[in-house]
């Protein structure tokens, strides 16, 4: 059998087509036989040769059959029914609307956003009286958060919403509550709205009272716990439909024997500023919220969380407790509003802050102005300094009585106070109309705190301005806030963006325990024992660095550059008495020489 016979045998029944461009598989390729030496040439019978040829012929033919081109059957285009075409068109329109207004949603079967309050009347049978109340408050067109949150809550879906400050979140949860409750019932509380501060809860209550006019619904705000027994006790015949309060007061009433509140009929459970209520650390509301949520035993209740920032504790709690959850985000998550002009101002030291704020006053401030500090002690100190400068200023903090705080907020709203100094107490949700400037006198401990602070200005589309002072000690937290300013359309120096990122553990520590800052004062105060201790510890550190430098190679070169600095620091840190003694010795030596 020669080469031609072998080729014919191999190619028997094979058809070569131009269409098939596939390379032959490893099984179909002819593999060279292993070389056999003449001395070890195997002896085979003719029968075995024929059997092998038949086997190879079968294998090749079998493999070649798979190499033939398979014609794919053309897919039949699915014809959509008129209903399916309408659904597809509606979904495309909803996505276009979301893209236009920067709305992002997560969840199954999320309803499309609404473009007007009239759509709610048509699709969800909104109360005519409620729509009239909205128009009387000049709410003629829904904001992006309202466009998406209203249809979700009107379907009684669990919701976690994040939208910038001043975007209309309060109206987004009050409207579905009022429309869902419809009219007054004597069963008791059917809606519970919780806020982290009394001022914010009072603001929500005022808004709710305006929207429930002539609807028959009764809204209540717990101003004093002592009066709650008369209004919520078993002897009281008056029943409220909506309760707005802080977690502390609600939990206190639940812990009384017997409990003064019955939350078993609650149909709506809403948390405003949920990230503050759920945050970890000192003065948190987690335990209180767990007790209150357990008391709301109605299995059909609708739960909604609203905030300007997303945090991990809120997301964990929502995923653990809520079913069929919808998540809505407006714009960039955890970002500031674009209507606020943001500035970072380096002031050098704590003393430079007073100089900077007085320069701003000299240039001409446009009231009203909010000034944020990190503690109530510093708020008092700054108040005294600015009061002596003749500025129309007031201060609000936790040590002031509730009556004083209410009067202070009222005066600031009316415009009789131009500058209001406050702590983090006023950084959440409070809506002051027309605040032109926010000054972060003390650098915010976290980026979330910064977003909420500057959110007191530039609300409802109005322009605003925010100035943040920072010293050398604040540079470690500078990068995060610089990124927020850049993401919201502002300009920051490039070196701020290239700074080292802070570790999570360090960021948590600084959030829990802010920096220990110098007192706000222009007075020259005498040195105290605490100052002497501080100086002695600093002196020890300087001496320790000198020892380390001496042990290094090339110490002389290094010391020449640093010796002057270390010497100046040591002379400043040494007690005044020792310095005087040294000066007297030097003068005596000079006199003796003369």
Curated annotation (Swiss-Prot):
GO molecular function: ATP binding; ATP hydrolysis activity; RNA helicase activity; rRNA binding
Record's compositionally biased regions (Basic and acidic residues): 36-47, 77-86, 505-561, 571-586
Region (Disordered): 13-86, 505-594
Domain Helicase C-terminal as annotated: residue spans: 339-503
Domain Helicase ATP-binding: residue ranges: 150-328
Binding site for ATP: 163-170
The organism's place on the tree of life at top rank: Eukaryota
Chain span(s) of sequence motif Q motif: 119-147
Name of the protein: Probable ATP-dependent RNA helicase DDX52
Catalyzed chemical reaction(s): ATP + H2O = ADP + phosphate + H(+)
Pfam families, A to Z: DEAD, Helicase_C
Gene disruption phenotype: Lethal in 2nd instar larval stage. Enlarged nucleoli in larval salivary gland cells. Reduced levels of mitosis in larval brains. Conditional RNAi-mediated knock-down in germline cells results in hypotrophy of the nucleolus.
Organism encoding this protein: Drosophila melanogaster
Subcellular location: Nucleus, Nucleolus
Family stated for the protein in its record: Belongs to the DEAD box helicase family. DDX52/ROK1 subfamily.
Keywords tagged on the record: ATP-binding, Helicase, Hydrolase, Nucleotide-binding, Nucleus, Ribosome biogenesis, RNA-binding, rRNA processing
SMART domains: DEXDc (SM00487), HELICc (SM00490)
Task of the protein: Part of a translational control module, also containing pths/DDX47 and ath/DHX33, which coordinates germline stem cell differentiation with ribosome biogenesis during oogenesis. This module allows for coregulation of ribosomal proteins and non1/GTPBP4, a p53 repressor, preventing p53 stabilization, cell cycle arrest and loss of stem cell differentiation. Controls cell cycle progression by regulating translation of mRNAs that contain a terminal oligo pyrimidine (TOP) motif in their 5' UTRs, such as non1. Involved in rRNA maturation or pre-rRNA processing during ribosome biogenesis.
């Amino acid at each position: 059998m020669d080469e031609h016979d072998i080729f014919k045998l191999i190619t028997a029944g094979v058809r070569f087509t131009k269409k098939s461009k596939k390379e032959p598989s490893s099984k179909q390729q002819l593999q060279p036989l292993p070389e056999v030496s003449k001395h070890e040439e195997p002896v085979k019978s003719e029968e075995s040769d024929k059997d092998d040829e038949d086997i190879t012929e079968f294998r090749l033919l079998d493999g070649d059959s798979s190499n033939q081109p398979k014609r794919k059957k053309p897919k039949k285009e699915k014809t959509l029914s008129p209903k399916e075409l309408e659904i597809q068109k509606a979904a495309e329109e909803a996505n276009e609307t979301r893209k236009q207004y920067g709305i992002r949603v997560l969840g199954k079967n999320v309803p499309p956003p609404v473009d007007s309050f009239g759509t709610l009347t048509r699709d969800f049978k909104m109360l005519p009286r409620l729509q009239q109340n909205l128009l009387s408050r000049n709410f003629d067109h829904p904001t992006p958060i309202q466009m998406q949150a209203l249809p979700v809550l009107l379907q009684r879906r669990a919701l976690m919403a994040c939208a910038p400050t001043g975007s209309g979140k309060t109206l987004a949860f009050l409207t579905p509550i009022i429309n869902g409750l419809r009219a007054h019932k004597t069963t008791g509380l059917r809606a519970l709205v919780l806020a982290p501060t009394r001022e914010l809860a009072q603001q929500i209550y005022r808004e709710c009272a305006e929207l429930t006019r002539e609807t028959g619904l009764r809204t209540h705000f717990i101003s004093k716990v002592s009066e709650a027994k008369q209004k919520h006790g078993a002897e009281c015949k008056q029943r409220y439909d909506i309760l707005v309060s802080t977690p502390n007061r609600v939990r206190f009433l639940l812990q009384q024997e017997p409990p003064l509140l019955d939350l078993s009929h609650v149909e709506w459970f809403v948390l405003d500023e949920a990230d503050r209520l759920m945050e970890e650390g000192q003065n948190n509301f987690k335990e209180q919220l767990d007790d209150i949520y357990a008391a709301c035993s109605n299995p059909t209740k609708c739960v909604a969380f609203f905030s300007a920032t997303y945090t991990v504790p809120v997301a964990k709690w929502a995923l653990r407790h809520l079913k069929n959850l919808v998540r809505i985000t407006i714009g960039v998550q955890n970002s500031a509003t674009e209507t606020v002009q943001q500035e970072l101002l380096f002031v050098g030291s704590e003393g430079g802050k007073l100089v900077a704020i007085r320069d701003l006053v000299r240039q001409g401030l446009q009231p009203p102005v909010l000034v944020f500090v990190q503690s109530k002690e510093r708020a008092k100190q700054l108040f005294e300094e600015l009061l002596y400068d003749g500025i129309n200023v007031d201060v609000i903090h936790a040590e002031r009585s509730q009556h004083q705080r209410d009067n202070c907020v009222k005066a600031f709203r009316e415009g009789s106070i131009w500058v209001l100094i406050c702590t983090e107490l006023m950084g959440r949700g409070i809506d002051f109309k027309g605040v032109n400037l926010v000054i972060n006198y003390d650098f915010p401990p976290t980026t979330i705190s910064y977003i909420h602070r500057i959110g007191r200005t530039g609300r409802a589309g109005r322009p605003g301005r925010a100035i943040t002072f920072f010293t050398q000690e604040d540079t470690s937290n500078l990068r995060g806030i610089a990124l927020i300013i850049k993401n919201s359309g502002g300009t920051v120096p490039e070196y701020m963006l290239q700074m080292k990122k802070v570790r999570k553990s360090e960021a948590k520590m600084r959030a829990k325990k802010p920096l220990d800052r110098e007192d706000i004062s222009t007075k020259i105060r005498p040195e105290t024992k605490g100052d002497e201790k501080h100086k002695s510890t600093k002196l020890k550190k300087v001496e320790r660095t000198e020892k380390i430098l001496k042990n290094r190679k090339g110490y002389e070169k290094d010391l020449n550059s640093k010796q002057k600095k270390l010497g100046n620091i040591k002379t400043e840190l040494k007690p005044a008495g020792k310095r005087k003694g040294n000066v007297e010795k030097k003068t005596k030596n000079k006199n003796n020489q003369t």
